[in-house]
Every structure is written in C-alpha cells, then in structure tokens.
C-alpha cells in the first residue's frame, strides 16, 4: 500500500507517519511506501520519503499524487487566525487546495482513499445545541467556512465515485508539542505546554471558557481507524465529527496540577486578549460524535490523560 500524507510536516502529520510505520499495515495491507509532503520538506523520518507539495499549485499536487497512490491523508491547511487575517490566502489554500487534491485524484481514475481533516470551526451561528453530524454548518469565521466547503467537496467527489473519501471534524488538539502557531486556539496548548517546560504562558480567556478537546495521540489513532472504515458503513455523508470531550480552561489547569503538581500553575498569566476572544467565543463546544463513536473512534477518558500523553510523548528531555 502506497500512502501520502499531505501536511506531513505538521504535528499530526509527523505523529501519523510514525504510527503508520510502527504498525506497518493499513486496513490489513502492508505499507510499501509512505510519503510525507508539505509546503517545505518535512523532517526526515526513517522508513518514509519526504517531498514538498504546495496544494495551491495543481502542478505540485500532480507531482505528489501518482497512479500508485492508494491513500491520501489531506491534513494541510492554514489555521484559523491566519485564515481570518488573510482572506485570499485562506481560500487559496483551504478551499482551492482541497479542490486541487480531489481533482488530481479524480483525474487518475484509480479511486484513491482520501482522508480529509475538517474542524469543529464549521459550527456556529444559530445552529441549535447540542451539535453533531447533522447540525447545520454555520461557521462565523472564514476558516470554518472553508472547511465546511471542503466537506461538501469530499462528499460530492465520493458520491460520484471519483474518490473513496471520508472526513473528520477535529476537536482542538491539546496538548500539542512544539511552538505556538497562528491558530486562535494555540493558547489551549501553550498554557499547559510552556508551564510544563518551566516557561511562562498567557491565557487570553477566563477559567470558565468551555471548549472541545482531543489529544494528539487519540487524534492519530482515530485517523487510522477512520481510514479503515468500510465505505459501505459511511452512509450518504462521509464526513463526521471526531470524538472529543468538553472541558473548561479551569479543568485543563486542574488536570495539569493533578499530574504535574502546583508549580506549573504559577507560570500562567491571565490576560484578556480581545482579538483572540472575538474568534474563540464564536466557537461551539456542546458537540456530540455519535456516528464516529458507533464506528469505533474514541475520545480521551480524562484531560489528565492528555497531559500524561504530552509528558510521555513530547516533553523535551533536559
């Protein structure tokens, strides 16, 4: 089996690549080739090839997706705050990039499997709680609108038999390793990651702010399970909510204290940032993932697990 991860240089892409290599199989078939592709050459990984791919450029996409490509994980995107600030670039990457990948897959005529990552940012506006697979997508930000459009494309290309598609609306992934990015949700990892590493972090919202979370470890497990779901079991809508859990910022901090003690809490500064609050307070959190749960995908049992996974998998060693 030949697998391509577009967005293979990112946190989830790197972890997904490593897990697939560890398994050696996908859907019961041996992985013969794994390619990590991104806008810049991803970090090298033993057992995988790396290449550059600009999904906004059809020629670049065509060079990456070959007739031998069996499975495409489409993870690449520009994130929420960036897409909000740069309207044109958001649509160029998040909408037209998705179109370019699907159109290349269609042109091959081989019906590759496409696993698309959407986002809980598709929810918003006047849709009624609780939200889930059949809720109206009514994002109040450009990033969510672009992801909603991507879901519709994946559904239509799948309906026409051009690809074997499936899409998953990711919860906010926390605790993410690395450095803060331009996502409005970036602080939802940094207020834990930085203090766990002995560094100060700023929280721009109050402790009562509620959100919907999943750990990187569970996200990767779910993407692999999602790729292995039989096409017949997906139904007419091949895109669905990935399971997560709702917690407040205060509960996240309490979980960190339970796992790592009281010292990291002293490194959090609570400072309101209206430009971030304006985005994240438009997001929704009362979200249910009934379809994915029935298909075998899972959420973390507690946020203490999320903290432990970061310490086990990602915390830099002194």
Question: Which ranges hold each PLM region?
Answer:
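N-terminal Rossmann NAD(P)H-binding glycine-rich loop of SDR-like oxidoreductase domains
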Residues: 3-26
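NAD(P)H-binding glycine-rich loop region in Rossmannoid oxidoreductase-like domains
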Residues: 55-93
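Conserved Rossmann-fold NAD(P)-dependent oxidoreductase catalytic core, especially the SDR/UDP-sugar
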Residues: 99-141
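Conserved beta-loop-beta element that borders a ligand/cofactor-binding pocket
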Residues: 151-177
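Glycine-rich "substrate-gating" loop/helix at the edge of Rossmann-like oxidoreductase active sites
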Residues: 171-185, 205-218
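Alpha-helical substrate-binding/gating segment
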Residues: 188-202, 210-239
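Mid/C-terminal beta-alpha module of Rossmann-like enzyme folds, strongest
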Residues: 218, 222-277
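Amphipathic terminal alpha-helices
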Residues: 272, 284-294, 301-318
């Amino acid at each position: 089996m030949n697998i391509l991860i577009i967005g293979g240089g990112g946190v989830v892409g790197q972890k997904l690549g490593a897990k697939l290599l560890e398994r050696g199989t996908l859907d019961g078939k041996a992985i013969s080739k794994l390619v990590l592709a991104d806008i810049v050459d991803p970090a090298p990984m033993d057992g995988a090839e790396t290449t550059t791919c600009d999904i906004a450029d059809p020629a670049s996409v065509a060079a990456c997706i070959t007739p031998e490509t069996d499975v495409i994980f489409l993870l690449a995107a520009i994130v929420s705050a960036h897409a909000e600030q740069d309207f044109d670039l958001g649509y160029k990457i998040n909408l037209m990039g998705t179109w370019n990948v699907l159109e290349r897959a269609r042109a091959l005529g081989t019906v590759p499997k496409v696993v698309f990552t959407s986002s809980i940012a598709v929810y918003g506006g006047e849709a009624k709680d609780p939200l889930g697979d059949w809720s109206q997508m009514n994002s109040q930000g450009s990033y969510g609108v672009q992801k909603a459009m991507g879901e519709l494309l994946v559904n239509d290309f799948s309906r026409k038999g051009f690809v074997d598609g499936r899409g998953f609306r990711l919860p906010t992934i926390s605790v993410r390793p690395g450095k803060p990015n331009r996502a409005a949700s970036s602080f939802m990892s940094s207020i834990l990651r930085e203090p766990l590493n002995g560094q100060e972090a700023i929280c721009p919202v109050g402790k009562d702010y509620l959100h919907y979370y999943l750990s990187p470890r569970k996200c990767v497990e779910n993407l692999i399970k999602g790729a292995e779901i039989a096409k017949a079991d997906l139904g007419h809508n091949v895109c669905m909510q990935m399971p997560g859990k709702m917690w407040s910022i205060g509960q996240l901090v309490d979980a960190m204290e339970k796992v790592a003690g009281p010292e990291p809490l002293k490194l959090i500064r609570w400072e309101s940032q209206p430009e971030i609050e304006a985005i994240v307070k438009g997001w929704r959190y009362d979200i249910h993932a009934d379809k994915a749960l029935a298909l075998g995908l899972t959420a973390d049992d507690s946020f203490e697990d999320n903290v432990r996974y970061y310490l086990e998998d990602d915390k830099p060693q002194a």
